[in-house]
Amino acid sequence: MYSDRVALYKQLEEAFDSKILAYITSDRPNMSAQIAPDVIDYFIDHLDKIGPCNKISLVLYTRGGDTSAARNIVNLLRMYCDTLQVIVPHKAHSSGTIISLGANEVVMTKQATLGPIDPSLHTALNPQVPDGSLFPVSVEAVKGYLEFAKNELSITDNASLASIFEKLSDFVHPLVLGEVYRSKAQIQMMAEQLIQNQVADPDKKRKIIAFLCSESGSHDYTINRREAQNELGLNVKKPSLEQYELIKKLYDDINDELLFSKPFMLTEVNGAYTVRRCLLESVVGGSDYFSTEGVVVRAPMPDGQIAIQNRINFEGWRHDRSSDNDNLAITDGEEAIVYERGADYQT
């Protein structure tokens, strides 16, 4: 719980000589979450309370999400600090890696991993699979299909390649294929802009972006600390033993609350439930969380079976009142302004 973590945040601030902000999107099976634009306003609330400072360290755990939201988070954080550090306890994949590229340095534990940043598209025009859901279209999957035809099957004449592309468009809507091309170009441009604060050498930047956007081969590929530092050339730091122990304690406490590895099963729920799926926390800003709240109702069927109904009553962000201090100091970089929360503070 936040009441246990706030002491760890304070110790981390001392250990890194920085202001700590934690952003966690759960990958719990059946109750996962992603980086999304709706978190931006909550970042602003926390950063306004932190105020302009020399250094901000973002503790980040995520499997990815909206790439534009990731870019906006980096740009917003940079408005409040001179140096941006990202601390990766475990996973910062896809859009999480985009955020990491925008930092001046990335602190990775020995178990931490980054990942490719080639986007997967989720649109209403995506192909439908037998269970009725929409199948995400990966930029690299489309590229791999076309390269397989050219490189492995040795198809080079334009007429045959056109036929292969037409066959692809029978399964993937042409507008989705167009969006694939646009997204790849956008990701490359975004990565080039963000990485400037971490890597100066143009050739090294091109190498990093090319690998993350296409040459890794699979969106599931993971990049450990050694590869990120020695082979890619990112500005990666190893935490000290003291720093690592604090990071690990923080991760374990968050995992105990969000249950990353425990699938959410309706068959195991009876009655009301509340599941926290995202966290955004700081010492002065308290704890904001994205929650899904509902009721599981069991009803007997004529054939003797039991039907399980999941009635979701609320899904969105809430503020944890128990994380509030009676008085919070807001600073504009010069003089601290102290105010007391009113009874009308939003929950």
Regions found by a protein language model. Name each.
Residues 1-347:
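Terminal-region recognition feature
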